[in-house]
Each structure stands twice: as C-alpha cells, then as structure tokens.
Amino acid sequence: MKNLVAQKWIDECGTLFPIDGNTVLYPTPGSGIFELYQGKGQDKRIGLKKLSEKFEFNHKIYDVGCDNLFDIIQKTWESDKFVEENKNLGVIFTGYKGTGKSVGAKLLCNRLDIPVIIIPDNEIEGMVSFIQQLDFECIV
C-alpha cells in the first residue's frame, strides 16, 4: 500500500487552501539563483523556481582586479549602519557591450551568498507586488 501523507491546509486571509502533505515550510528560500515563476493553473500563483546554487561559468574568468571593489561592496553591505538601519544598497555596472558587466554582477552575487531573483522576459501579472512583499535580503 502506498504511503499516504495527510493533506495540509494553509490559511491565507481567512481562505483555506489545500497543499500537499509533503510540503515543507521555510522562512526564506535560502541562497541560490531563482527565477520568478507563475503557475499555469487557475490561480496563477507566483513563486520562485530554483535554477542553481550559484552562477556557473563555462569559460575562464580572468582576474581583472575586482576583488578590492567587491571587498568594499561587501564591507558596506555588512556594516553596522546598513544592518542596524535596514538600508538598501544599489550597485550599478556600466560599460560597453562585452566588457563584463553581467559576469561581474554574477561574481558579486556568488560572493555575497544571498538569494538572486531573475526576472523572466515574459510579463507576470502581479510581479511588482510580489517583489515588494519579499521580506528577506535578496538581489533582483
């Protein structure tokens, strides 16, 4: 006989929804690379689909002296002022096409070891609201 796991129910604003009994609840998605995902069902629920643990490169990455800059960014992010005052930190990469902006951003993401959320090309209804309601440190 098949092992049956009791169905669980979640309460969302007074409405109960059934979920699989094997469902595990986490306070955050944890570190990794995620893509914003919208379910195909009737409710079109938005979630995060894990793509990988870290950004991986299938080509050699040369040392171009970014470690000092990454150190400054990481020290700023982890500083008492940012932690105590719950501040945000924006980093803008600029340069011509092919100069390594995307690679640099991915290397920084790997180093900070916090969730990275990739926004897909297709439009997701309710995406802005979903992102605004995230209550954990992440890179979008």
PLM region spans:
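AAA+ P-loop ATPase mechanoenzymes
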Residues: 1-79, 93-98, 108, 134-135
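Walker A/P-loop
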Residues: 87-119, 130-132
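Phosphate-binding P-loop
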Residues: 77-88
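Conserved nucleotide-sensing/catalytic segment adjacent to the nucleotide-binding pocket
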Residues: 128-140
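Short acidic loop-to-helix transition motifs that present clustered carboxylates
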Residues: 121-127
